[in-house]
Amino acid sequence: MELSMFGREDTNSSQWGEVHGPFMLEEIVCQAQNMLTSRGIFMKSNPLKYALPLLLLQMSVIIVTSRLIFRVLQPLKQGMISAQVLTGVVLGPSFLGHNVIYMNMFLPAGGKIIIQTLSNVGFVIHLFLLGLKIDGSIIRKAGSKAILIGTASYAFPFSLGNLTIMFISKTMGLPSDVISCTSSAISLSSMTSFPVTTTVLAELNILNSELGRLATHCSMVCEVCSWFVALAFNLYTRDRTMTSLYALSMIIGLLLVIYFVFRPIIVWLTQRKTKSMDKKDVVPFFPVLLLLSIASLSGEAMGVHAAFGAFWLGVSLPDGPPLGTELAAKLEMFASNLFLPCFIAISGLQTNFFEITESHEHHVVMIEIILLITYGCKFLGTAAASAYCQTQIGDALCLAFLMCCQGIIEVYTTIVWKDAQVVDTECFNLVIITILFVTGISRFLVVYLYDPSKRYKSKSKRTILNTRQHNLQLRLLLGLYNVENVPSMVNLLEATYPTRFNPISFFTLHLVELKGRAHALLTPHHQMNKLDPNTAQSTHIVNAFQRFEQKYQGALMAQHFTAAAPYSSINNDICTLALDKKATLIVIPFHKQYAIDGTVGQVNGPIRTINLNVLDAAPCSVAIFIDRGETEGRRSVLMTNTWQNVAMLFIGGKDDAEALALCMRMAEKPDLNVTMIHFRHKSALQDEDYSDMSEYNLISDFKSYAANKGKIHYVEEIVRDGVETTQVISSLGDAYDMVLVGRDHDLESSVLYGLTDWSECPELGVIGDMLTSPDFHFSVLVVHQQQGDDLLAMDDSYKLPNVEHQKIGDTGIQQRFSAEEGFTTIDLGKR
């Protein structure tokens, strides 16, 4: 057949047209040779008639359009997947594709084949990464609650949806092909994919919330249910022939080879590289790509999609660092950000709204009604099972909406079914549209209904001031990102002067950014996987604090945790642990790290966001620690110089009172010099009317301390405005090792006049922001008192007995830890 029969220009890189196939009309594409790159417009050569320029144009238009649509949909909390599908819809036959000239220029048949091939390669790699981030053991950690909800989330829609088909087919009569397509669509609508759910949770910043952890486990259970049903259906409908049995055994053999051959090879190569001296590349990148290609090719040879082998190869490998982290960093950039948008957009390009309207309206309406009924049954089944498990009604509704969210796995399955003619074009269009509609509404409602910060609002007062007034145990939660944070945190603990009569409980939380795994982690240190590189750093942190504990035996009680979550939501773990352990004060590092010469060495924007989120939602008081200790190398706790001089800058307000309460505890340490600098305006010298009597009592107590102890000093600075206040603070120089200050002050105070107009770091307050200047070389602790009603109930669970009459050397004194200490592990698997 000559190309001229197709009615196209012979200068195109490809020619196409319809020919008679064995069963129906099919489209054939003839690709011209030597039409890869254009000679240029100056040589009168149209670049769009050549393969490479056309491919680059297609990718550019798809990526730019998807980003624009995503930006438009952002206020509605829609995901990138929805934006990419809508990109295909806009660029496809539903809208712009009605223009024949545009379609022949932008998406000719030959150009479509090339971009489909490349995008499928990107999708195979992306699915491998999704599998790599899955921890197979998570299904074993799912408690009975997650198993019940996950099973109900699949069983209700699958069974009731098929019953609806049976009822409608008997009462109204539906053709057999419509029944077959709709049954397949029901099985797809009933499933909830674990990778999709974790992606949605991460995008909504609730992956490590209580609801997020429950949804993670439920989605895994639901997906396993869909696997079993699909396997049973496949075995039931498959022809009972030796060929079918041979094909099934080959697929099982591929899975066994992946797990028992490919996996050990990759793990062995990774361990070998990790132990080598070359730390630049700890992952066998090219061997992994080779085995990935073999697994994908084997899947295609056995009659399944190439992504099947890639996905299960990823599942078989250990998630998290080093393998998962390194591979994700190298592959996600071009696979997930470049080729994947093209793959999803092509699914939208295959969607044609006009084919739906032009087809039989009765069948279209029936299919859509059945699909909506299926999603409704999924929602009701999940909500009912959640309510049965005594989940709060708001959380049950949000969980039901989350289980209705679908994404790339479902879109991919629909495309495969369309190519295999399991569903027709009409059903394919309806499924894609319904997924967009249901997922879009569900995501928006979850954002509107669920606020994880409400869970962290404590019903009792947990402040340092309250601890001091009612003789309660001081309980600290220390957030750390690396071992460099340890020495100054140890200095802070030592400055608070733990004794057997006034002990301290503290909890360390190693904060790790989630990379290379899909689900968040909050676990005690002793339960961490020893093969995880984060365990090694956590062990260094724990060992340092354990040395410190040995120094204060009987006066300290500690527990050590590690949290791995996206930085955008890791504040949920901080607040969860603080609430669970009834912490009095959360101490978190400042987002700027200072070099040894005092200048700013590194600025970490995500850590600043964490600090702001913790300040807004914390169930207790919060302190941001500006560390100006030695930052050269990994400091040893044994070599750290303890603080000798501490100052407190007092202006007025609740936060200053909170900082003063902590300062007064430090003043009890015999070998620590403590100075309180009280800023007062000249007009207030004769006015002793304080906004809070507790503030007045604190100052009076400190003055009494200063009168009786030589190492405690009270200094009153008389200033007229903010300029003189700044001059006094600037004169501190290097006289102190650490300075305490409240975050918020009495803004009506004249001593701040002129200072409140500008602030670079509002999370530190006016004075705290001033102390971040490189002119100062001491560490700073900015304290913010617990927010909420002053009438909060007092929690005396950790009340200390009155031992003022006891002597320090009395060995008969019992340890002053509450019998209800509750130093137990957090079982996150049974949510």
UniProtKB/Swiss-Prot annotation:
Membrane-crossing segments per the record: 50-70, 89-109, 112-132, 147-167, 214-234, 250-270, 282-302, 303-323, 334-354, 364-384, 397-417, 430-450
The keyword Transmembrane belongs to this UniProt entry's keyword annotation: yes
Protein name as catalogued: Cation/H(+) symporter 13
A Pfam family this chain is assigned to: Na_H_Exchanger
Similarity field: Belongs to the monovalent cation:proton antiporter 2 (CPA2) transporter (TC 2.A.37) family. CHX (TC 2.A.37.4) subfamily.
Coiled-coil ranges (or none): none
Miscellaneous remark of the record: K(+) uptake enhanced by a proton electrochemical gradient (acidic outside). Not affected by specific inhibitors of voltage-gated K(+) channels.
Alphabetical list of InterPro entries matching this protein: Cation/H_exchanger_TM, CPA2_transporter, Na+/solute_symporter_sf
Membrane topology reported for the UniProt record: Multi-pass membrane protein
Cellular compartments annotated: Cell membrane
Induction details: Transiently induced by K(+) depletion.
Gene Ontology BP terms: proton transmembrane transport
Top-level taxon of the source organism: Eukaryota
Annotated tissue distribution: Preferentially expressed in pollen before and after germination. Detected in pollen grains within anthers of the flower buds or in pollen on fully open flowers and on the stigma, and in pollen tubes growing in the style. Weakly expressed in roots.
